[in-house]
Amino acid sequence: VDINVTFAAGGVRDDGHAGLAHMTSTLLDMGAAGLSADEISSRAESLGAELGTGSARDMAWITLRSLSDPAYLQPALKLLADVINKPDFNERDFVRERERTQVAIRRSEQSPATVAEYTFFQSTYGDHPYALRPAGTVDSIAALQLDQVKAFYRQYYVARNAVFSIVGDLDRKAAEQLVEQVIGQLPAGKRAPAVASVPELTRAQEQRIYHPSTQTHIRMGAPGMHRGDPDYFPLYVGNHVLGGGGLVSH
């Protein structure tokens, strides 16, 4: 059984605190219901399950892959529910992850591909939240406080802001019971407001950045369309025909 619980709790919700959504997502499985990160990982492994968290600009998610046998699925679901409903948000874990994130950001800034990506988003989206780095910057992460993480969790990790996806050996009734078991303890809360529309580009831009790399990295693009647009999939396929989807020089 594959389960994906998605919340509209990505980086666009950071509200001036770049990296807040990313930090909140990261801390979910660093400690929950009194279990440490190692204990959570060990329990999942002992059940043959895979548990993970992640976030991006639009969303944050918690995933579980488990055997469908109730002897394994039920304790795995309990673990998933604890991570979603009872994160500890321990100060020690927060300080460690804040430092680790800063190190990762500094390392990423040495990558020409990453520098090109960040510059592209900033140039394309301007003042829109999509322009911000989901992981934050060294300075924005240093300024984060644990109380901000807890407040972000309380606002966005609520039932009305969740989408539950299940694929596997379950009928509808069992799936509904599973959803109730996992997020039934969450407060109803409110659905996150829609993200502001992306402004259209008014002129072409060119950014050149020196980097001591053996290769040149080039990014070109512009705001496209919404997933629900009837032309989305024809253009998606057409992009692959033109070489999109991983074409390399080989």
What are the roles of these predicted feature ranges?
Residues V1-T26, L35-I84, R98, Q102, ...:
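M16 family metallopeptidases and their MPP-like homologs
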Residues A18-M30, N239-H240, V248:
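Active-site recognition of the HExxH zinc-binding catalytic motif
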Residues A37, S41-S46, D88-R106, D171, ...:
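Acidic/histidine-enriched alpha-helical segments
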Residues E50, R219-G221, L242-H250:
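A structural supersecondary motif
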Residues L80-F89, V182-K190:
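A common structural junction motif
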Residues G126-P134, A159, V163-H226, G244:
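An aromatic/glycine/proline-enriched structural segment found at the starts
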